[in-house]
Amino acid sequence: MPVIAADKPLHLTSHDVVNRARRALGTKRVGHTGTLDPLATGVVVLCVDDSTKLVQFMEHDTKEYLAWVSLGAGTPTLDAEGPIEQQAEVPPLDEDHLREVLKGFLGPQQQIPPQYSAIQIGGQRAYAVARAGGQLDLPARDVEIHELELIGMFPSVQAAPRTFDPQSWTPAAAGLTFTLPEPLGEFPTLLLRAHVGSGTYLRSLARDLGAALGVPAHLGGLVRTRAGRYSLRDAVSLENLTEAPTIPDLDALDFPRIEADERLARELRQGKRPAHPQRGRAVVTLGGELVAVVDGDGEHLKVVRAWA
């Protein structure tokens, strides 16, 4: 079975989604291509049976989000799980100034992950240590933020839009309506649209954005609207997994394509390094069938994984 885009509901972990898919689809071979926090909703891409071999190539796909950033209150989890640890008055905010601040977060950068995360150091999960009252020294990680757009400023999460046009992800009178976590109070809230690289934590972004504005902050709500090629508008609920439209393996891979001839396909399947001008990762096909995922140095292709 190929790839499925599932719509994760509030409060479930990504592992919960995988377990439900295993039961619904009658197979243990289910993996996902990117964790989504329990207090977030949206796209979780599932790879089933033979398609699980694609996970290693899809977990680095870029992601797109709608994010509600609440200013004036900080929490240890950096989201609405709470409790509130820091609180401060939020000064009047100017939209032009905010947009300039947001520009400073664009591009490659280093980001410190949340203490409440699945990152493992020395055999210990950060969230397990944090819940036991400890704290790990989490090194900053290289991430990239491609786009960060301010949709609007609102007096609270409750006052911010929750219904969006699924084509443009702009607030709308009708469309998709999202369930957000119970708010921790009435705090000024920024509604953002973000396009980020793999490994970027929107909870950390909320914390860092608050710091740039001189106030504590937390993520009041988060919806993943896209993961790689998969849009939330095409995702199915967990109750409808068995009826989900499936995506062929070839269409699931978001890389440039090289159409091979018989000789090139044969050499790649034999593990050789044929000459080719491709630079970077690519998918090689033959007659519409997946042959290999390769890395090119501008002179030769190196097989990362081949399909018989």
Swiss-Prot record:
Record carries keyword Isomerase: yes
Catalytic EC class: isomerase
GO molecular function, one term: tRNA pseudouridine(55) synthase activity
Reactions accelerated catalytically: uridine(55) in tRNA = pseudouridine(55) in tRNA
Gene3D superfamilies documented for this protein: Pseudouridine synthase (3.30.2350.10)
EC number(s) stated in the UniProt entry for this protein: 5.4.99.25
Pfam families xref list: TruB_C_2, TruB_N
NCBIfam families noted in UniProt: TruB
Family, per entry: Belongs to the pseudouridine synthase TruB family. Type 1 subfamily.
Official protein name in the record: tRNA pseudouridine synthase B
Organism: Deinococcus radiodurans (strain ATCC 13939 / DSM 20539 / JCM 16871 / CCUG 27074 / LMG 4051 / NBRC 15346 / NCIMB 9279 / VKM B-1422 / R1)
